[in-house]
Amino acid sequence: MKNIFKKLLIFMALLLFSCSPDNLTNENETITNSDSNNPGILKTSTSKISNTGTSKIWNFDNLTEWEDATQVGNPNYWIENGNLRIFANPNTWERSKVKTISSFAAGTYRWTVFVPEMGVGDMASIGAFLYNNDTHELDFEIGYGKQAIRDQLAAEPDDLIVYMTSQGYPFQSVQKKIKRGQWYNLTLQLTLTSNGRYTVSWKINDAIMATVQLSYGKTTKFKIYCSVENLQFIGDQIPQSQNYALFDAVEFKGI
């Protein structure tokens, strides 16, 4: 009888220990949108949180976790066949933008974007960028480009110009040619130096195009933007065409 009682006590102790909250972990917890079980929107954004960082993918079946950031004109964007279609109208200075509600720091940011033909000479920019304030901003901006820059780069008629810019601390802007009518992966990679400052690299289809060491670091966080804006620096005339872009996905992988 004593042996049976002892075995029963041991069994109960093991059962209680195995259910203790102290033994549970959320290291690999997957947090999904409340609609994630709906098969019609399988690409909704998910977030996987662990002790080593955060990763998120937005596939643009909806605009969950994004908000309007339009500065001039109406919000010219919608979801179309699993893409974010965003545009700016001719003969305006419209600046159509969306941004993430949350802010992010060191890691890899990637935009998958279709770059169409754009109006010849139009002051219009497709933007994929990170923004904290006007001097803490890291950009991809794609447009027809001013003729002087096109001449300098020996651009062909089917070339567009991509500007890869740090707006401050320090300021740096690098211009390259890309072909219109193609999908691109645009990547900003922010790593940390030993003193906690950012080094940023601009990549197009995983090839490094530019790099700069910034004088600020991990205490500066950014919101992620997608945009089409009519901006004077990137062409020679007020836009004569409606210019647009398609964003298929945005991804962030923290470190």
PLM region descriptions:
Residues 14-50:
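Bacterial Sec-dependent N-terminal signal peptides
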Residues 62-84:
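Extracellular glycan-recognition surfaces and repeat-rich motifs
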Residues 76-92, 158-162:
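Short carbohydrate-recognition loop motifs
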Residues 88-158:
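Secretory/extracellular carbohydrate-interaction modules
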Residues 95-102, 172-178, 214, 236:
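Beta-strand-rich interaction surfaces with strong enrichment in secreted/lumenal proteins
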Residues 108-110, 216-255:
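Ligand-recognition surfaces built from glycine- and aromatic
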Residues 111, 182-192, 200-202:
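Short tryptophan-centered beta-strand motifs in secreted/extracellular beta-sheet-rich domains
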Residues 163-185:
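Short, aromatic/His-centered strand-loop micro-motif at the edge of beta-sheets
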